[in-house]
Amino acid sequence: CSGNTGAALARRNVGESVKQINTAFPHWFNNNYKKFNDKVDSLPVDQHMLIALIAPRPVYTTSATEDLWADPVGSYISISNAQQVYTLYGKKSGLTPEPPVPDTAIIHSILGYHNRTGIHDLTPYDWGKFILFAKYQYGLGRE
């Protein structure tokens, strides 16, 4: 799980805000980022653009159903919006227009995702999905 300034879109203004994360964790970001505390709509980039910079390499994001502070929907929109750049590289993702139901992972794709039932945490379920995704990306266990 990540949330604001992780996978979730900052300019969506849902859950944790740029101002809140800068206030709670002032050591995480440089002072320039704090200039956007009260004008998040002026940010020159948003998270989907940063995810797209990873193309054509694989990316896996995750959320948790009870972690509304981290905006699970915004995280899925973000990774979905990054698909456009992957397409430029000829990489087709297995993402669906709508987020998958909780506890359903998208593994066999260049862009992977799951929304686990529960709170903001990293659980054995999450680690298991990360490992399956990595194995798939490295050609281990492909069907």
In which residue ranges do the predicted regions lie?
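Arginine residue identity/basic-tract feature
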Residues: 11-12, 57, 116, 142
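Mobile cap/lid helix-loop segments that gate and shape the active-site cleft of serine hydrolases
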Residues: 1-50, 75-96
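Short, proline-enriched alpha-helix->beta-strand connector loops that line the catalytic pocket
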Residues: 53-59, 107-111
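Conserved strand-to-loop "acid loop" that flanks and positions the catalytic carboxylate
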Residues: 55-72, 116-118
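Conserved alpha/beta-hydrolase "acid-adjacent" motif
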Residues: 68-78, 123-126
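C-terminal catalytic histidine-bearing segment of alpha/beta-hydrolase fold enzymes
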Residues: 24, 80, 86-143
